[in-house]
Amino acid sequence: MIFYSTTAPGLEDVAAEELKELGCRIKEERKGKGRVFFEAEIEDIPKLNCFSRCSERIVLLLGRFKVEKLEDVYKAVKSIDFSFIKPEQSFAIRANRVGEHGFTSIDIAREAGQAVIDRYKEDFGVRLRVNLDEPDVIIRCDLVDDDFVVGVDTTGDEALHKRNYRIYQHPAPLNPTIASSLVRLSGWSHNYSLLDPMCGSGTILIEAGMIAKNIPVCKFRENYAYKKLFKLPEPEWEEKDVELKLYGMEKFKKHVEGARKIAEYVGIPVTYIQGDARKLDEYFDSIDFIVTNPPYGLRIARKGIIEDLYSKFLESASKVLEKKLVMITAEKNIARHYAEKFFEIKEERNVMYGGLNCSVFVLE
């Protein structure tokens, strides 16, 4: 069976590598488009939803088409066999559109929905119910330029980044799928120390700890869309007993306290410090890996504050870092200038995150 996963555009190769480790056969990475197509079995769906840390959702592909006009959407969807939907089940279309088109995502959803209803009625004499709020079956219709993919969402309306462990809400939390991707890009493993010097509520450290201890993302979540479609056994897993050297630093006391609550809830031992990321050498003699998401996207009037933070952070990091530093930021020019001054830039990649064109830097 062919599936596709969605991820942050720019991190497709990271998601693909993880999917390979889960036993999938990669068919295509749509670089810059946030899609990875792969082969897997229906029986793999629970495992993929439980252990895909770098993907947003897992979708079972029903069809892939070239679409130029809105009428093409109706024709494409109507050509699909929807016999897997039971007559008593409801459905909803979730449409997404990227590129230049003479129609909207709402138009796609309307045409696709009508096509599903018409095809099912022709085949079975039953008009399927539409339920936009709590559908039994979610059909994804994603149009990227002229590439139209239709699939059954096995994850649900809540994407996989909804880990449900955030018992403390930071005002600007990092998406956990991106956090996991950054950890993977760093090459960190539990044998080494890891520091996030601007940790917020600790997402990067929690994700690193869950990877090291083999804690699945489904530990804190039960509602997956596939459970209304397939009767599949839950994946078996065993938590690893590993020693971790995880350190988080945060400027504000309330965030430190919140991060500690989350770490305790998940069961990840993290040492949190209230401190200044511009003075890392005052807190640490050496750190193997640094992975962080520093502040960015602030008003022009505050660029001076950002430049001071980035310059002093990277300078102090250069005094304690043993291996690699990975950071994501929308402040590309400032980050690049000081990264080149204090490190060697091993990689810079564009990543779309939260509507911002960001860069991920890998430094040594």
Place the predicted regions along the sequence by residue.
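Class I S-adenosyl-L-methionine-dependent methyltransferase catalytic core
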Residues: M1-R25, E29-V36, A40-D44, S79, ...
